[in-house]
Amino acid sequence: MSDIQSLTTQALADVAAAQSPDVLEQLRVALLGKSGSITSQLKQLGALPADERKAAGEAINQARDALSHALGERKAVLEDAALDARLAAESIDITLPGRSAERAGLHPITRTLERITGIFGRLGYELSEGPEIEDDWHNFEALNFPPHHPARAMHDTFYFGDGRLLRTHTSGVQVRYMGDHAPPLRMIAAGKVYRSDSDQTHSPMFHQVEGLLVDEHSTFADLKGTLAEFVRAFFERDFEMRFRPSYFPFVEPGAEVDIAWQQPDGSTRWLEVLGCGMVHPNVLRNVGIDPERYTGFAFGMGVERFAMLRYGVNDLRAFFENDVRFLKQFA
């Protein structure tokens, strides 16, 4: 019993004299560690006579508790002292200018999307949104896609097990809009779309803006004038444009729009930027609009495509790699 008392007295004195956290940790290990003095005393209880074990066990436990408490208190004192010393050593020059707050910036795709929708908003088009998970009717069938069309294939479209799919274009929003609004109407649909494709100029997820106008006297000339005005407003300069005949199931006739794009070396080449056409009569019938009375035109564009042209980006994937160094250029 006297051994544990003398051990405790000396240990408490050593703890009180410790001048650093490292020394304190060494004492903790030497006293309360697996091979520590107090731990060894506990292990030796079994060798004592039965009538002495209880008193000895209580004394050892009391010593262990006292040492644990002393170690904790001394640690707190040393940590406070270290903090005070560090604060005393640090000085603040109150004449230095304050740090400016970090300012965030819009992602270049968001900037481009807002620019596109803003231009069409000024032309009287209403922005509409729809679900990214679509059914076959809104994504394909209502838009005059035949059952054998390649776009319905698994390698082009992301399907769910129940037959639903990730929309491959925002045209489904147009179908919903025409079902809820009577002509005359003009609207644009903007948002994410998904296709099974990934390379330097394609991404499995990208952003699209599609526009629609339905009226009694809309013509291809109206479509051409609308797109010419948009291209001029977006790039803030005039371009020579050409409309090439092309096939899209939901328009007839259909066309792809090219602009005469000037290369860094001064040469010019035709660059495809849009798809468009007059709304197919079957699409109008599918949403309850009389194609004998109404005609319409539609157009669509990839937002990333326009962002790449506006900001001079060569690789589409750079927009989605979250490299802050790249994104800060556009903030």
UniProtKB/Swiss-Prot annotation:
Pfam families: Phe_tRNA-synt_N (PF02912), tRNA-synt_2d (PF01409). PROSITE patterns: AA_TRNA_LIGASE_II (PS50862). The gene is pheS. Belongs to the class-II aminoacyl-tRNA synthetase family. Phe-tRNA synthetase alpha subunit type 1 subfamily. One of its GO terms (cellular component) is cytoplasm. InterPro entries: aa-tRNA-synth_II (IPR006195), aa-tRNA-synth_II/BPL/LPL (IPR045864), Phe-tRNA_ligase_II_N (IPR004188), Phe_tRNA_ligase_alpha1_bac (IPR022911), Phenylalanyl-tRNA_Synthase (IPR002319), tRNA-bd_arm (IPR010978). Tetramer of two alpha and two beta subunits. This is Phenylalanine--tRNA ligase alpha subunit. Keywords: Aminoacyl-tRNA synthetase, ATP-binding, Cytoplasm, Ligase, Magnesium, Metal-binding, Nucleotide-binding, Protein biosynthesis.
